[in-house]
Amino acid sequence: MNDSQRVSILSEALPYIQSFSGRKIVIKYGGSVMENDNLKNAFFRDIALLSTVGVCPIVIHGGGPEINNWLRKLEISPKFENGLRITDQKTMEIVEMVLMGRVNKEIVKGINKTGSLAVGISGLDGNLIQSRELGDGSHGLVGEVTKINPEILDPLISKGYIPIISSIGSTLEGISHNINADFVAGEIAAAINAEKLILLTDTQGILKEKDDKNSLVAKTNLKEARDFIDKKIVTAGMIPKTECCIRALAQGVKAAHIIDGQIEHSLLLEIFTNSGIGTMIVA
C-alpha cells in the first residue's frame, strides 16, 4: 500500500469517526476469533482504536471452545441439543469459572495492554442481566434475558472505561444461567440505546445463496431480514443471529451488523469504510 492509499483510507474513515464519536456500539465477541492469537490481538487493537477516537465500545463475550476444553479436562462430556448446551449444576459452575475467571480477564488484559482501559464484569454484577430458565427447562440452567439493568454501565462508559461483559445472568433468587451471548448483546444494545449492534461470527454475513460467497447481502432492512428467515435463505445457526438483530432493531437500535470475525480488523472495516465487510440490517 502506498502513501496515497493510506491517506485515502484515513480520509474515508473521517466522517464515520465524526458521526460515531460519543455513540455506544455493542460488540459480541465470539467464534473462532477467540482461538487465534493474531485475530485476538487485532480485535483488542480495534477496540482500543474505537475508544481512542471517541466511540464507546461495549463488548459481550461467550466462550464455547474454552468451556468445552475445561469440561474435557475435568472428564465431563459437553452435551448439546438444538445448538444449546445442556447445562446442569456442575457444568454451570465450570461455565461461570471459565467465562468470568478466564475468558473475561484475558480480554481485559489484552485491551489494557494496548493502553486503553477495560473493566471486566458479568451479568451478575449489579443485577445487570436478570434471567429465567429458557423454555421448559429441558436444557437445565440455560437462560433467557428478562431484564437488563444498565445503570452499572453508565459510570464506566462516562469515564472512558470499556465494559467487557460475560454472558451470565441470574434470577433475583441468585440462580445463575448460561445465556446465548448474541441475545445478551442484543438486549444490552437495546437497553443502552446503542447506535450499533455488531456480531462477530464465523461467516461473512447473510448470503442469498448458501455456498456462494459473492451473494453477500451488504445491506437490508427489518422486513427483508424476516423474509430471509421465512424463505429459508437464512438457515441453521444464522437464524438466531438474524433474529437477535431483528429484536434489537425493533427495540430502537439504529443498525445491526453480522460480520466475519475471521478477517483481521473486520470491525474497523465494517464501521469506518463505505463498503463495509458484512451484512448491515437497518429498521
UniProtKB/Swiss-Prot annotation:
The entry's substrate-binding residues are: G63, G64, R85, N178
Sum up the protein's function in the record's words. Catalyzes the ATP-dependent phosphorylation of N-acetyl-L-glutamate.
Query: Mind telling me which residues the site (Transition state stabilizer) is annotated on?
Result: K28, K241
Q: Name one GO biological process term.
A: arginine biosynthetic process via ornithine
Does the keyword section mention Kinase?
yes
Q: Which gene encodes it?
A: argB
Annotated coiled-coil positions are none
EC number of this enzyme:
2.7.2.8
Any Pfam family matching the protein: AA_kinase
NCBIfam families of this UniProt entry?
Answer: argB
Name the enzyme group at the top EC level: transferase
Its lineage reads: Bacteria, Bacillati, Cyanobacteriota, Cyanophyceae, Synechococcales
Which species is the source of this protein?
Prochlorococcus marinus (strain AS9601)
Matching entries from InterPro entries are given as: AceGlu_kinase-like_sf (IPR036393), AcgluKinase_fam (IPR004662), ArgB (IPR037528), Asp/Glu/Uridylate_kinase (IPR001048), NAGK-C (IPR041727)
As its record notes, the protein acts as a catalyst of: N-acetyl-L-glutamate + ATP = N-acetyl-L-glutamyl 5-phosphate + ADP
Query: What coarse category fits the chief subcellular location reported for this protein?
Result: cytoplasm
- How is this protein annotated for GO cellular component? cytoplasm
MF terms in GO: acetylglutamate kinase activity; ATP binding
Keywords assigned by UniProt, alphabetized: Amino-acid biosynthesis, Arginine biosynthesis, ATP-binding, Cytoplasm, Kinase, Nucleotide-binding, Transferase
The similarity comment for this entry is: Belongs to the acetylglutamate kinase family. ArgB subfamily.
- Cited CDD domains: AAK_NAGK-C
Pathway where this protein functions: Amino-acid biosynthesis; L-arginine biosynthesis; N(2)-acetyl-L-ornithine from L-glutamate: step 2/4
The molecule here is called Acetylglutamate kinase
> Where does it reside?
Cytoplasm
